[in-house]
């Protein structure tokens, strides 16, 4: 197990936040200052910052900090402390090669997310969603412990590096099923739509970003069973594309969109070649960034758990928010020349080059179906007439735009658009990270 400055800094901030009320502005300034100090004082060649574990940690850190800044709170709240726990668990997950340490990280991650979802106790929907997540997550954790026990009984060690080359080990199979559950891959996806619908925006961002990044980082290091991952990939593509067609709630649409994205992420992992894994990580980063833009951008004109038809209210918002939201939706739909198309093209081309032609054709069909309901959002934003039953929300619900949300939306949008102009800024970093995973 290798710890470095990531975990140390997060642990120090976590301890301080438990004792003092840290202002968000001071926290952001400290984060920026610490980042600049690390950039100018650390020897990147000796530290191997561009290794696979380092890149996953940096991504978890960045998206975690963005999630903490969501909202209009002036100080770090108890929810933000729980998000810190999720960030620390995600970082240690990709640092360790011990099965018990990995189990503790999964539990810390699950329990923190469970409390984040259920923190508003006066909402029955949130309580229901948190209980579903907790119970089903406990079942997957039990499968993980059973797999770890089988490995320990047979091999006498708790190091998962000894099972990397074992394709049909029962212990490895159970561990893979537990990790795929955390990732939300079909047929282990049944909890995602209900949990997403019962989550508010901050819980939704935590649930849809940090676990996916950390679990994907572990899956690449495990080199999983190709046939098991392929079955889950194809089922995820079909379920995510077909299941979202008739959805009326935004959160449920995002849930099936996440399942479809999981299918493409696992699709590159099936190839077991360099450019396939590189394409999967590029797709994961761009999907996470665009997911953040959609959630934060829709929050500017809509409420939590809104209907999709309410996107017609976005015409009353500033034009820049509409443009950014539209570009993000088109990107995640895979419309060229946006970043989402680039990521899907890299993943599908890597699969075709390794002989998965029929699976690639199926993925293209599923991407076309998925693009249809993304384009439906664009149609509602620009061409849908306003409905009379939505007028009461305009009158009774104030339209608040916290400054932090606007800053996050601008920075994330700049990143997604900048990738179109200079894709090497992301691909070169992921290139070196992927090399280190082989």
What kind of region is each of these model predictions?
Residues 1-438:
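Alpha-helical transmembrane segments of multi-pass membrane proteins predominantly involved
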């Amino acid at each position: 197990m290798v710890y470095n400055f990531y975990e140390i800094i997060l642990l120090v901030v976590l301890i301080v936040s438990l004792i003092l009320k840290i202002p968000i502005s001071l926290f952001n300034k400290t984060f920026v200052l610490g980042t600049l100090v690390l950039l100018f004082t650390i020897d990147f060649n000796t530290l191997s910052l561009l290794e696979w574990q380092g890149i996953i940690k940096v991504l978890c850190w960045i998206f975690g900090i963005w999630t903490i800044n969501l909202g209009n709170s002036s100080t770090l709240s108890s929810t933000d402390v729980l998000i810190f726990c999720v960030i620390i668990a995600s970082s240690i997950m990709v640092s360790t090669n011990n099965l018990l340490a990995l189990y503790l990280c999964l539990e810390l991650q699950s329990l923190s997310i469970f409390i984040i979802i259920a923190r508003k106790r006066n909402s029955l929907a949130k309580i229901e969603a948190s209980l579903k997540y907790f119970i089903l997550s406990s079942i997957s954790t039990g499968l993980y412990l059973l797999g770890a026990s089988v490995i320990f009984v047979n091999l006498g060690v708790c190091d998962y590096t000894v099972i990397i080359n074992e394709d049909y080990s029962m212990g490895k199979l159970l561990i893979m099923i537990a990790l795929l559950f955390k990732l939300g891959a079909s047929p282990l996806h049944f909890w995602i739509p209900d949990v997403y619908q019962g989550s508010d925006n901050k819980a939704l961002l935590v649930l849809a970003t940090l676990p996916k990044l950390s679990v994907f980082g572990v899956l690449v290091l495990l080199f999983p069973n190709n046939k098991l991952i392929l079955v889950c990939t194809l089922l995820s593509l079909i379920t995510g594309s077909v299941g979202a067609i008739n959805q009326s709630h935004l959160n449920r649409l995002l849930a099936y969109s996440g399942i479809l994205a999981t299918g493409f992420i696992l699709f590159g992992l099936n190839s077991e070649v360099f450019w396939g894994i590189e394409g999967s990580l590029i797709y994961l980063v761009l999907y996470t960034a665009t997911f953040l833009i959609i959630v934060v951008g829709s929050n500017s004109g809509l409420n939590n758990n809104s209907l999709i038809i309410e996107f017609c209210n976005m015409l009353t918002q500033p034009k820049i928010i509409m443009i950014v939201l539209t570009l993000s939706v088109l990107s995640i739909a895979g419309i060229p020349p946006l970043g989402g198309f680039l990521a899907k093209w890299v993943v599908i081309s890597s699969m075709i080059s390794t002989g998965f032609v029929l699976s690639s054709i199926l993925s293209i069909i599923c991407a076309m179906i998925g693009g249809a309901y993304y384009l439906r959002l664009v149609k509602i934003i620009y061409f849908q007439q306003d409905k009379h039953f939505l007028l009461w929300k305009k009158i009774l619900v104030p339209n608040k735009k916290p400054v932090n949300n606007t800053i996050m939306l601008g920075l994330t949008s700049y990143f997604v658009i900048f990738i179109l102009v200079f894709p090497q800024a992301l691909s070169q970093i992921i290139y070196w990270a992927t090399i280190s995973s082989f």
